[in-house]
């Protein structure tokens, strides 16, 4: 088919899609053309923007996030939480009629713990140098920074928490009879809350040693201030683990002789103790909502969604995926839109950053910048600027146009929400529907623009 004829057919197809999505729905049409909160001007949409912008709904995405963050909770690489999330994501994408592939890969053991306090259970890290696969129950004794541990703490759960490094005091507690040790970290910087961790101990001990997040340490100390507290602690070494990438694709509507594809991606795992609402449940549900919206729209390229496992342990899932691609496969990818932390409610993180590894423009950053201009969001965006640390990196290293898109502070890329990587990264405390909607519109419009051309 001649290029001009193909364009006419494509334009007609988009028109039909637009009619189906907004032409018969005055409310949706009005929403597509209204000026957004925080936008500089009313949108000046191109023809392909309408069927995307009129249909994406942050509230639909939120329903997926309630499953991932509230119901499943922490999604640690290779463990039950990540596997449940994998199954949910795959089921949603299959129901949307995508061709779904699960890509397994082996990962290292994970050392996790739990603390049962009354009716609450907190997930923590546990030390590989402590006793594993063990449960201990006892009265908690708070020894502050561990500099003055009583001579006899037999059978007690010794709690050590301070701003300074508290790891060394564990050995004294173990030698004096502690049943288990809880190490808490209290951050000196009020803008950076500290996460649960797996303590590295210079000398192994034969009791469980758990690493608490800052908020867990604070909550435990608050309970202790009211009286005696009894807890049940457990340590588990998760062995022989397999993590998964979830890949979903639909072919181009029209002849695609070069088999070109546009990728929209996010990671679905989280760090220990964190339900990962923003990091990166938000990016994951953005992908699921865009998969719904884009599934029937006419395209000149294939659309591929990829949800990565094991990002939090070194981009393992995306690196594995890229390592399995042939050179022709790599050259077929027009662009990779990575979405990592796209909905924080933290007020100072009001800039939507375009983050390429080298700080240079590429097809993805240009498409998002153009979409921001059309939608009136240009003043809320910055970049591209140089930043790695997410799943766009392996693609960039192979020459694929790729970038990460994320809400962060205006003062710098490191200005993330204080609840980053903590148990406080919840829907209630750290999700903005308005910012999620902006992210959906920007990535949806940008990705569809690449898919159409």
PLM ranges: what are they?
Residues 56, 298-299, 308-414:
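Metal-dependent peptidase/peptidase-like ectodomains
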Residues 44-47, 55-77, 91-99, 150, ...:
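Catalytic-core environment of secreted peptidases
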Residues 48-55, 71-80, 159-163, 169-170, ...:
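Second-shell loop/turn segments in exported
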Residues 24-51:
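C-terminal segment of N-terminal export signals and the immediately downstream linker at the start
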Residues 413-453:
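His/Asp/Glu-rich mid-to-C-terminal helical/loop segments that flank catalytic regions of hydrolases
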Residues 120-150, 197-277, 292, 296, ...:
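Soluble metallo-hydrolase cores and metallopeptidase-like ectodomains found primarily
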Residues 1-17:
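N-terminal secretory signal peptides and thylakoid transit peptides that target proteins
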Residues 43-47, 51-157, 167-168:
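Noncatalytic luminal/extracellular "stalk/propeptide" segments of secretory-pathway proteins
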């Amino acid at each position: 088919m001649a290029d001009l004829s193909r364009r006419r057919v494509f334009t007609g197809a988009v028109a039909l899609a637009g009619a189906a999505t907004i032409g018969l729905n005055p409310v949706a049409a009005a929403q597509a053309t209204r000026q957004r909160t925080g936008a500089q001007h009313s949108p000046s949409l191109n023809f392909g923007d309408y069927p995307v912008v009129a249909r994406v709904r942050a509230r639909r995405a939120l329903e997926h996030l309630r499953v991932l963050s509230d119901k499943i909770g922490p999604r640690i690489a290779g463990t039950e939480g990540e596997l449940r999330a994998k199954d949910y994501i795959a089921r949603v994408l299959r129901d949307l009629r995508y061709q779904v592939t699960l890509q397994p890969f082996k990962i290292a053991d994970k050392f996790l713990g739990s603390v049962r306090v009354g009716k609450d259970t907190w997930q923590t890290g546990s030390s590989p140098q402590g006793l594993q696969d063990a449960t201990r129950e006892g009265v908690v004794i708070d020894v502050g920074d561990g500099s003055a541990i009583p001579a006899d703490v037999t059978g007690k759960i010794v709690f050590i928490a301070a701003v300074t490094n508290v790891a060394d005091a564990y050995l004294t507690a173990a030698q004096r009879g502690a049943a288990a040790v809880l190490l808490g970290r209290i951050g000196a910087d009020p803008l950076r809350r500290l996460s649960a961790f797996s303590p590295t101990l210079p000398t192994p001990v034969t009791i469980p040693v758990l690493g608490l997040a800052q908020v867990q340490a604070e909550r435990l100390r608050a309970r202790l201030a009211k009286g005696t507290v009894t807890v049940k602690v457990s340590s588990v070494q998760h062995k022989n683990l397999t993590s998964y990438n979830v890949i979903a694709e639909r072919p181009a509507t029209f002849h695609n002789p070069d088999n070109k594809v546009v990728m929209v991606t996010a990671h679905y795992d989280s760090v220990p103790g964190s339900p990962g609402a923003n990091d990166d449940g938000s990016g994951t549900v953005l992908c699921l909502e865009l998969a719904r919206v884009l599934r029937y729209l006419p395209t000149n390229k294939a659309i591929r969604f990829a949800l990565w496992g094991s990002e939090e342990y070194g981009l393992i899932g995306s690196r594995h995926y890229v390592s399995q691609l042939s050179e022709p496969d790599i050259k077929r990818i027009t662009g990779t839109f990575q979405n990592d932390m796209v909905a924080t409610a933290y007020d100072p993180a009001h800039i939507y950053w375009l983050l390429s590894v080298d700080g240079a423009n590429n097809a993805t950053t240009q498409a998002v910048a153009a979409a921001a201009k059309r939608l009136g969001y240009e003043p809320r965006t910055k970049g591209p600027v140089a930043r790695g640390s997410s799943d766009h990196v392996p693609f960039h290293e192979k020459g694929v146009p790729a970038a990460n898109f994320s809400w962060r502070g205006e003062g710098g890329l490191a200005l993330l929400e204080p609840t980053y990587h903590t148990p406080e990264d919840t829907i209630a405390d750290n999700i903005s529907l308005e910012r999620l909607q902006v992210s959906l519109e920007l990535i949806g419009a940008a990705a569809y623009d690449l898919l159409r051309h």
